[in-house]
Every structure is written in C-alpha cells, then in structure tokens.
C-alpha cells in the first residue's frame, strides 16, 4: 500500500490536516473573549493532557491495524464495526461544504490580486457574493479541482510532497503578517491612539477580572471544544494518516510535533489578527468565524492604506493553504475508505468521490439562494444548509464518536493495546500513566459534556 516516506512527511501532512480555518477564525476570537493569556494557559494544559491522548489514540489505531476507520474498528472488535461507519460519516458530511468555504477564500484572494479590495471592505459585500447564483460555484470548483488533483497523485507524490512545500510557506506567511501587525498604529477621530503592541498585550496578558467558577468552566469548555475540533480527531482522518506511517517511525515524537505545529499556528494567528483588529476597530471589532475573515479583516486591510493590498494577498493565500491541506485530508480519508471498501484503484475512487463532492457542494452553494432556509438548531444558533451539515458532523457526531472510542479503548480493548503500539520499537512512552488515566476516566466524561453542550442538549436537560 501507500505510505509516507518518513516521519517528517507524516508530521507535516497531519499538521496540515489539523491546521484549518478554525485555527485562524475561531482561536483568536475565543482568546480575546476568554481573558487572553488565561485562555492560552488553559489551552496549553489541555493540549498536553487531553489533546495528546486523542491524537495518539487515532494515529496508533491506524498504524497498528493498517486500515481506515471503516475497517479499523472492526479489526479492533467486530461488535464495534458500527463505530467505523459512524466515523466514515463525518468526512462524508464535511466534504459537502469544506470546498465551499475554500471557494470563498479563493474569491477574496483573487479579488485582492486584481483590485485594491476597497469593495470587499464595504458592508454587504460578503453576503452579496455568497447569495449570488454562479460566482460561489465557480470559485468552489477551482478549490475542489486543486484538492482532487493532489489526492489523485497519491500519498507520497501528492499529499506529502504538497505538505512539505505548503506548511513551511504557511508558517512563513503567518509570521510575516504577525510581525507586521505588531508595528501598526492608528489614531481615532477623537485622538485615541492604539498600537499593535497594546493589541498584543490584550491578547497574551491573563485577565482574571470577574473570574468566577462558572466563568472558568466556560473558558475551560471553550478551550476544550476548540482543541477538540482543531486536532482533526474522530473524523477518521488521523486513523487514515496513521495507517500510512511506517512502523519504525517514533509515534510519541510525531504526535508531539503535530500538537506543537497546530498550537503554534493557532497562537500566531492570534498574534496576527488580534493586534490588527484592535488597532483599527478597537476591542469591539473581534468577531468569530466567517464574519472575522470576510467582513472585519477586509475593513482592517482597507484602513492600512497602500499596504493593505499586499497584506491581504498574503493573508488569503495563507488561509487558502490552511483550508487546502485540511480539505485534502478529508477527501483522502473518503478515497482511502472507498478504496478499501470496493477494492478499486485510487484513480477510480478519486473520480467517484470528486463527483460526489462536486454535486453536494453545488447544493450547499445553492443553500444561500435558491434553496435558502433558516433552521433553529438545538444549540440556539440559526443555520442555513451549510451550518446544518457542520452541526451534524462537528457538534453531534465528533464528540459522540470520541466518547465511544474512549470507551472502546479504555474499557473494552484496554489502553495497553495503544501503549504497546507507541512503544513498538522500544521507545519509552513517558506519559503512559497519564494516557491510561485520561482515556478511561477523563476523556469519556469530558466528551459527554462536550457532546451535551455543543449539541445544545445540555440546555434542554438543565
């Protein structure tokens, strides 16, 4: 079968999967909302305890079984075959809309290349674009074609080669923009001066004011859900990528490097976005999700004057990289599962998954015009078609799958199965004790809480 050439290829591909739009459009916002450095601290502790357990589990399952999610769980325990099917459902749902978001990013990148982007800074520009009939479909097509081409080329020639170029590029771009952000200053009409360094302080300085137990639990929950969704676990992706890892690779070291990469990018994203938004829009300007990237930031780029355009080009290129590496990993997981299921070659399955992705993505694009509806989701948000898909896959399925996986590994198969795989080549798994405790007691409880909160069922119960 196919495999990564060595540990660096695996680490960069897996980090590329983990680093997605969420690192950039959600992490800085949560940080600004949740007391800056306090959130960072909580997040770091969680990465080292909770994150490492989830990541190690998925990768080890993949490498030991050398199978994809659909077959891996069956190999672990035939009674748990259903968990493989559930896991397969996640990338199946995510693939319907991820290239649509990728298309939005592509559109903004092109806009800043061919114009100064003044239009993009006006109110209603983003809404006008996503509700138009043809444009979002065209840009989605470009993004999807690029994704499919990389997956079509295979693991070593496609995904690995591409990740080795893109990931260093992503880090470089994000670093340059972050440093630039710190040098910004702006004077308001009333004479208030704000600087990038003040914005940095607002980002990293822990704010303990008004901290209650309830507030701390909110921060903990925010950090936990951000981490969980950031690491690409419980979607079968890390199981697939794990199955491509050669036996002699040190898993312990590799998973640590993936975590460092993922957290580093999230931290740098905050250093890039928070000071820039703070300088031009003040503390009220911080938004989350698409509105941060496609509405707030174009206003910031506009306010930068002549430098706005090159910075915007660099920014949307970097966003495109983050989205592309993630979309590739989702598509690869689908293709790999289908290859295993139907025993057909990569090229055929890539075509089939490509056609499926194309049709469903067109439907998602139409969800903003022809098929527009508003649905009140159980977690209180009002969503369109894209949000509904996101809700089912992210809020409902992912925590549920993680809960079941931790029960399967912790209580049915036993943590030693995973620990043995990590120590396959005689490496010492330093955090084995922590792993045992976490996978059995902490992860199931945390995942149950996360499931209840992210689905909105918690509000219905309590």
Specify the residue positions occupied by each region the protein language model found.
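Transmembrane helix-boundary motif of multi-pass solute transporters/channels
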Residues: 6-44, 237, 253-256, 260-263, ...
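Membrane-embedded translocation segments of transport machinery
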Residues: 1-4, 160, 164-324, 328, ...
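Select transmembrane alpha-helical segments in multipass membrane proteins
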Residues: 3-14, 40-42, 79-92, 138-143, ...
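Membrane-water interface regions at transmembrane-helix termini and the short interhelical loops
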Residues: 30-34, 60, 75-76, 82-91, ...
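A generic transmembrane alpha-helix motif of multi-pass inner-membrane proteins
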Residues: 379-410, 430-462
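Helix-loop-helix connectors at the membrane interface of multi-pass transporters/channels
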Residues: 102-131, 242-248, 253, 257-265, ...
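Membrane-interface "cap" regions at the ends of multi-pass membrane proteins
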Residues: 1-25, 54-59, 63-75, 81-82, ...
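Inter-helical loop and helix-membrane interface segments of multi-pass membrane transporters/permeases
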Residues: 30-34, 67-86, 99-158, 186-221, ...
């Amino acid at each position: 079968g196919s495999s990564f050439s060595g540990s660096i290829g695996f680490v960069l591909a897996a980090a590329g999967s983990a680093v997605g739009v969420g690192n950039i459009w959600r992490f800085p916002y949560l940080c600004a909302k949740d007391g800056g450095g306090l959130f960072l601290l909580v997040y770091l502790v969680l990465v080292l305890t909770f994150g490492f357990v989830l990541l190690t589990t998925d990768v080890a399952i993949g490498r030991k079984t050398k199978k994809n999610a659909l077959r891996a769980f069956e190999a672990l325990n035939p009674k748990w075959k259903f968990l493989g099917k559930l896991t397969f459902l996640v990338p199946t749902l995510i693939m319907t809309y991820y290239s649509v978001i990728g298309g939005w990013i592509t559109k903004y990148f092109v806009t800043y290349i061919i114009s100064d982007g003044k239009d993009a800074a006006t109110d209603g520009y983003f809404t006008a674009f996503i509700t138009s009939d043809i444009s979002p479909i065209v840009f989605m097509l470009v993004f999807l074609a690029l994704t499919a081409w990389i997956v079509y080329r295979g693991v070593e020639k496609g995904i690995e080669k591409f990740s080795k170029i893109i990931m260093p590029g992503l880090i470089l771009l994000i670093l340059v923009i972050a440093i630039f952000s710190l040098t910004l200053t702006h004077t308001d009409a009333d004479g208030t001066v704000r600087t990038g360094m003040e914005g940095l302080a607002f980002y990293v300085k822990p704010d303990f004011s008004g901290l209650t137990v309830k507030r701390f639990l909110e921060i903990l929950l925010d950090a936990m859900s951000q981490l969980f969704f950031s690491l690409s676990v419980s979607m079968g992706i890390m199981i697939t990528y794990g199955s491509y890892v050669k036996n002699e690779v040190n898993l312990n070291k590799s998973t640590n490097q993936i975590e460092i990469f993922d957290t580093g990018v999230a931290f740098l994203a905050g250093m890039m976005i928070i000071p820039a938004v703070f300088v031009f829009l003040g503390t009220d300007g911080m938004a989350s999700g698409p509105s941060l990237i496609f509405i707030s930031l174009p206003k910031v780029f506009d306010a930068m004057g002549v430098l706005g355009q090159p910075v915007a080009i660099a920014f949307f290129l970097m966003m495109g990289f983050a989205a592309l590496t993630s979309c590739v990993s989702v598509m690869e997981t689908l293709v790999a599962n289908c290859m295993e299921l139907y025993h057909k070659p990569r090229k055929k399955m890539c075509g089939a998954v490509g056609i499926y992705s194309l049709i469903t993505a067109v439907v998602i694009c139409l969800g903003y015009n022809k098929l527009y509806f508003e649905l009140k989701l159980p977690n209180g948000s009002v969503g369109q078609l894209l949000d509904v898909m996101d809700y089912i896959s992210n809020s409902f399925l992912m925590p549920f799958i993680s809960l079941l996986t931790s029960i399967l590994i912790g209580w049915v198969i036993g943590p030693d199965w995973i620990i043995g795989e990590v120590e396959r080549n005689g490496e010492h798994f330093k955090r084995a004790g922590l792993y045992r405790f976490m996978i059995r007691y902490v992860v199931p409880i945390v995942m149950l809480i996360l499931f209840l909160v992210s689905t909105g069922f918690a509000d219905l119960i309590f």
